[in-house]
């Protein structure tokens, strides 16, 4: 919000909180074609997880694990975001671990940065060597 007073622009910061609430983060182990748009990604979420539940984020990577898409159902609609690593790749679990894995927010932060998220626990504590 901005106000124009005395010929100067004043900016008022009033941020109510996060725009998109995410209560659970799910990672699919099978790769997805990164050309997929919102409808295709949503169909994939339903196929892998059974449903797109409100306030849940669903993560998919391509075969090379250097690109990731995140689909979030915010309770009203669907958001689809993409991330690409220019160097290296995301630490993605193999298919042998199952169809999906639940992550906590600290693990998601590590994953998005390309770090080994499996070693990060609650509060950013390293739990595995």
Residues covered by each model-derived region:
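Polybasic/polar functional segments that serve as interface/processing modules
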Residues: 1-129
């Amino acid at each position: 919000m901005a106000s124009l007073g005395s010929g100067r622009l004043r900016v008022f910061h009033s941020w109510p909180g996060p725009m998109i609430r995410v209560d659970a983060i799910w990672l699919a182990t099978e790769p997805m074609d990164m050309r997929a748009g919102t409808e295709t990604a949503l169909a994939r979420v339903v196929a892998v997880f059974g449903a797109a539940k409100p306030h849940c984020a669903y993560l998919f990577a391509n075969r090379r694990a250097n690109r990731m898409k995140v689909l979030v159902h915010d309770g009203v609609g669907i958001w689809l975001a993409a991330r690409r690593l220019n160097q290296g790749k995301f630490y993605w679990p193999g298919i042998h671990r199952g169809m999906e894995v639940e992550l906590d927010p600290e693990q998601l932060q590590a994953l998005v940065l390309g770090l080994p998220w499996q070693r990060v626990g609650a509060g950013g504590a390293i739990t595995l060597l």
